[in-house]
Amino acid sequence: MTWADLFGRVAESVVAKGKPPFDFAVVDEAQDVEVAELRFLAALATDRPDGLFFAGDLGQRIFQQPFSWLSLGVDVRGRSHTLRINYRTSHQIRAQADRLLPPSIADVDGNAEDRRATVSVFNGPAPTIEILADSDEEAEAVGRWVVDRIAEGVEPHEIGIFVRSSPQLRRARAAAKQSGVPATELGDKVETTPGRLSIGTMHLARGLEFRAVAVMACDDEVLPLQQRIEAVADDADLEDVYNTERHLLYVACTRARDHLLVTGVKPASEFLEDLLN
């Protein structure tokens, strides 16, 4: 049974019983809700216009292809509100990461998020972006950066190192080895370990927060991932691939509270030009 099948059966059960098991439902990370999951949530709400509360960020949509919520009976038009105060990320990191996204992002039903008026409540050092000659030089640079952060008082478990996909994890391991600080690879539980750096893929970074983050291996054909580009069938799919890959880098960068380092090897990802400019 697939995840979609499971939610489909549960939705049918809720409808058949006629009385939902909950009066209200709160949904976080709503930008990545899938079709079957939304059908289930719609069944929970029945005819209560205030039965569902969604919190999400279209700029962090990294899993789900866009689709119409309205077509599934969930209408949030005119009922959404954009949160504009950022408590997690410094002004400098947020402002630079925002260069990866357009000023306004809209969903399929026309609901738009205007990101231009967002403010952070604290300042910090400017992010560092480095394009290195090869992966050995990159590992040395990131290793030195980790040592510098620890010298400033950042604890090892407050430092995360992220890469696009599993094949690039070896570069994160190499950087951790250069720093001389032990590291833990994040798994399904996505838990940090006291006294150890955290390394993992960008998809595992969502929902986490670190005082310092290094985003490595931002190379050409790695970000955006060449395999995804080659697999698309038309221009619309290609645009969506580029958007989700941008969102993925945005998510990784905004896991940093105070310090952000972004690195790549020549030729670097085209997205780094957006971060720099």
Regions found by a protein language model. Give the residues of each.
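Conserved helicase motor core of SF1/SF2 NTP-dependent helicases
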Residues: 17-184, 188-197, 202-233, 241-243, ...
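Accessory N-terminal region flanking or inserted into the helicase ATPase core
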Residues: 1-23
